[in-house]
């Protein structure tokens, strides 16, 4: 039986996560946020308080969903997930009902697959990675943990993306390309050759 879910964060990505979970029929208990805003509800779901409220919950009773957005040069999303896992909370993966995910695709914990995404056969997606709106990933790709493929990204077959990579909106990655870890790809890029680790690639 599915546990109720508490969403971390209260920004735009948290709204999308909440909307997706509602479409999937999940019970969302509320949001936790450290932002000092005046909001009391988002999508008619209560803001429960800051993350200290989680001390009142057990990992036996609730699961978490990471609603903290992923942007380049900001590890907040991944740091918070690590801290909550150290308290034994679990982050289930979820797939938007309009996404297509081939039956043999491997998803690690905490993967978020958003509306209209396509993930083809032979592909694996690492822990806590966001496959955002209308992303297309073709056959036999490997996407590492803590990645964000922003809306409209296209990966041809055999692409390998290492951990911690941010691929900007509308980028296109040609077949069999490898992107090294902790690299940021600017929106609208087209990649024809491998990209090294720990760099920022501006639009070419």
Model-derived segments and spans:
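Hydrophobic, well-ordered beta-alpha structural blocks that scaffold small-molecule cofactor pockets
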Residues: 1-51, 55-58
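Small/polar loops that bind or transfer phosphate-bearing groups
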Residues: 9, 68, 175
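Short alpha-helical
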Residues: 12, 72-75, 106
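Alpha-helical elements of the RecA-like P-loop NTPase motor core of helicases
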Residues: 15-19, 75, 193
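Conserved acidic residues
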Residues: 29, 62-63, 163
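Glycine-rich beta-alpha junction loops
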Residues: 35-36, 70, 189
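Phosphate-bearing ligand-interacting subdomains
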Residues: 39-96, 100
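Structural signal for interior beta-strand "rungs" in well-ordered beta-sheet cores
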Residues: 93-203
């Amino acid at each position: 039986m599915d546990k109720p879910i508490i969403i971390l964060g209260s920004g735009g990505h948290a709204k999308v996560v909440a909307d997706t979970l509602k479409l999937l029929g999940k019970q969302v208990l509320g949001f936790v946020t450290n932002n000092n805003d005046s909001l009391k509800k988002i999508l008619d779901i209560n803001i429960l308080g800051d993350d200290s409220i989680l001390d009142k919950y057990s990992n036996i009773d609730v699961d978490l969903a990471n609603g903290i957005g992923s942007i380049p040069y900001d590890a907040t999303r991944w740091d918070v997930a690590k801290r909550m896992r150290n308290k034994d909370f679990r982050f289930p993966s979820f797939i938007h009902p309009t996404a297509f995910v081939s039956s043999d695709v491997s998803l690690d914990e905490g993967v978020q697959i958003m509306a209209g995404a396509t993930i083809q056969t032979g592909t694996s997606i690492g822990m806590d990675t966001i496959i955002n709106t209308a992303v297309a990933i073709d056959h036999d790709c490997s996407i590492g943990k803590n990645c964000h493929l922003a809306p409209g990204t296209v990966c041809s077959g055999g692409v390998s993306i290492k951990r911690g990579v941010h691929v900007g909106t509308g980028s296109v990655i040609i077949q069999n390309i490898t992107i090294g870890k902790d690299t940021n790809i600017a929106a609208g890029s087209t990649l024809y050759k491998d990209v090294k680790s720990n760099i920022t690639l501006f639009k070419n």
